[in-house]
């Protein structure tokens, strides 16, 4: 479950609230899409069901998910089984795997699930994706909202630098 959840957020930028509310009916396996209404904006969004994300979901559903009757994909693994909520356990999940990977963060309260959205946006900038594509991936209607997520890399800043004429 953890792997599938982390991968979906890292690769697709889905907000944790939308991830917790993801239902089987949101997955269009035939067209390889994930379609849902965002909780924060109430806008419909359609994201590609990337192969690695799809396989992680299949593995979780077939091998890790408790066999319970609920439309929600992600559920708790301790009785009483229910849909996963938006509590702070997600930040603990990220920190747990950071510790296992011997990764450290200067600011531990900024290494939760939401930081994976920031990382995705930064990676898309580094890959020179169009700003409009980044906004669409993050589910933003306004590019102003997307600007908050972008941390421009040093190499990209060097590309913008002007030559200094000799004096």
Role assignments for model-derived ranges:
Residues 1-167:
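Conserved catalytic core of the tyrosine transesterase superfamily
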């Amino acid at each position: 479950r953890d792997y599938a959840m982390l991968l979906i957020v890292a690769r697709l930028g889905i907000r944790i609230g939308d991830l917790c509310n993801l239902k089987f009916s949101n997955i269009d396996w035939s067209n390889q899409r994930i379609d849902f209404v965002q909780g924060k904006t109430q806008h419909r969004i359609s994201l590609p069901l990337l192969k690695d994300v799809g396989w992680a979901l299949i593995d979780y559903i077939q091998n890790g998910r408790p066999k319970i009757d609920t439309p929600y994909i992600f559920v708790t693994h301790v009785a009483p089984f229910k849909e996963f909520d938006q509590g702070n356990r997600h930040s603990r999940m990220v920190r747990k795997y950071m510790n296992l990977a011997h990764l450290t963060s200067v600011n531990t309260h900024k290494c939760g699930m939401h930081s994976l959205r920031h990382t995705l946006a930064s990676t898309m900038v580094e890959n020179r994706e169009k700003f409009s594509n980044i906004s669409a991936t993050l589910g933003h209607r306004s590019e102003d909202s997307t600007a908050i997520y972008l941390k421009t890399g040093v190499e990209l800043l060097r590309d913008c630098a002007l030559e200094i004429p000799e004096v």
